Amino acid sequence: MQVSVQGNDVDKALRLLKRKLQTEGFFKEIKKRKHYEKPSVKKKRKQMEAERKRRKAQRFRKPDRD
């Protein structure tokens, strides 16, 4: 990944890089790979994430009009 530094503004370029990495899920992936996760634990975590996603989607879904 590349971020160009314009006008010697390194801080701005660093913030831009961090934002890009955040949107790609880089930091989340690093946290997941820090320690080994057993397949059973991984399966359970994925199920919980999917359930959480379903609940969140249901909360923000527009009610059907009959």
Swiss-Prot record:
A Pfam family that this protein carries is: Ribosomal_S21
Instruction: Describe the family membership recorded for this protein in Swiss-Prot or TrEMBL.
Output: Belongs to the bacterial ribosomal protein bS21 family.
Example of a GO MF term: structural constituent of ribosome
Q: In this entry, which stretches build a coiled coil?
A: none
Query: What would be the name of the gene that encodes this protein?
Result: rpsU1
Q: Can you supply a Gene Ontology BP term from the record? A: translation
Q: Where is the composition biased (Basic residues)?
A: 34-46
Can the keyword Transcription regulation be found in this entry's annotation? no
Would the keyword Ribonucleoprotein turn up in this protein's UniProt record? yes
Give the highest taxon in the source lineage.
Bacteria
The UniProt entry, under InterPro entries, shows: Ribosomal_bS21, Ribosomal_bS21_sf
User: Could you give one GO CC term from the UniProt record?
Assistant: ribonucleoprotein complex
Q: Where is this region: Disordered?
A: 34-66
* Name of the protein this chain belongs to: Small ribosomal subunit protein bS21A
**UniProt keyword terms in alphabetical order:** Ribonucleoprotein, Ribosomal protein
Question: HAMAP family attached here?
Answer: Ribosomal_bS21
